[in-house]
Amino acid sequence: MGDFKMAKKPAKKKAPAKKNISKKKKGLTKADVVRKGKQLSNWGKWGKNDELGVLNYIKPKDIVDAAKLIKKGKVFRLGLNLDENGPQNGLFGGRWNPLHHMMATGTDAIAGRQDKTVGLRYADDFINLPTQTASQWDALAHVFAGDKMWNGYDAALVDSTGAHKNGIEKFADKMVGRGVLLDVARYKKKARLADGYGITVNDLNRTAKAQGVEVKRGDFVIVNTGQM
């Protein structure tokens, strides 16, 4: 038989190296917020004319029960000073910190400047401030969902003369109840939480558990961040 040569097997091609592609975790988007908002919406829950929202949960009995919790009669100041050292930096809505102006002073009185006008010596002042520059409650007319605000009212109902629906005056006789302080900064062993830290539901639940308190429907929850 004649000589023959074995055919060489073709060399195996090396598979291209797999790229190590790590999926970047997606952050919260506006679409997420809109979707969740529709899912959890309470619009219409208390009727089409409602302007109170979850304050409807507070009943006279809840206020009476809250009053029974007072033991020591201590009063805690939660307000901010109305002065130029407030929290506003102008980055949102062009807001500024309160400007306190004296219109009449004790030195005016001593100098006799008031005696010939009203015959009364007095001090008087005024404060110039956006309403978001100190301690305050947001009305349901404050933030819009598209062209609507709470309960489906048209955003145009807030005009240059003020809010014709969902104004803060609707809360005047409703903001009474049991207060629960959740000291998240203390739970995290921080004097203050870092700027921009997002407090999660788990943070609130764990803080409440550590403090031995239970947040109930109709409670007013105050969260301490250490920022102020």
Sequence positions of predicted segments:
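Short, Lys/Arg-enriched N-terminal segments with co-localized hydrophobic residues
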Residues: 1-5
